[in-house]
Amino acid sequence: MGLNIDPADMAHWTILCAERYLSVFYDYLHERIYDYHVLQADETPVLVSKENRTEGSKHYMWVYRTDKMYLDKQIVLYEYQPSRNASHPRAFLKDFKGVCVTDGYQAYHTIEKEREDLRIAGCWSHARRRFDEVVKALPKDRRKSSLAYLALKQIQAIYREENKLASMTIEERLKHCQLTVKPLVDAYFTWIK
C-alpha cells in the first residue's frame, strides 16, 4: 500500500509554498541584513536542466550572509540568478551601507566604484588559497624559502589572532582587532608592497 506521487508534482508544491509563504520571510530577512555593517558575498555555479537554456548550462547561486562576528544573529540568504552579471549583486546590495567581504570577483569592485557608501574587502581565505597552491606546486626543498610560504605564515598569524575573537563581545573584538590584528594586517600589506 502506498501513494505514488510524481516527483515533479512534489517539486511544484515546494515552489508554490516558497513563493506564497517563504518569500515574505525572505524579503523580511533581506531588509534586516542591511542593519549589519559587514556582510560576506559569494557566488557559485549551479547546473540547471530547464528554464529556456541549454540543459546543463551554468546558472549561479549568489550567497549573502552576515559576518561571523554577529554570532547570535546570523542571516544567510541565497539568491538564484541565471548569470554572473554585476546587476545581480548591485540589485541585492542596493540599500546596504558598509563593508562587503568577497572573493575578488570584479563585479563587486565595479559596484564599489559606483557608490561611496559601499566598501569591498578581500577574503583572506581566497588569498591564502592562492599562496597555498603556489607552495604545493613548488619542489619540497624550495617551499619554505618561497615568498608564497612567507605570505602564508603571515596570513596564519592573522588567523591565529582572529580565532581568539569568537568568544568576545563586539566591543572586545574591536579592541583586540585594533591592538593585535590590525598591526599584523598592516605589516602584511607593507611586506607585499
Segment roles from a protein language model:
Residues 1-193:
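Catalytic center-proximal scaffold of phosphoryl-transfer enzymes
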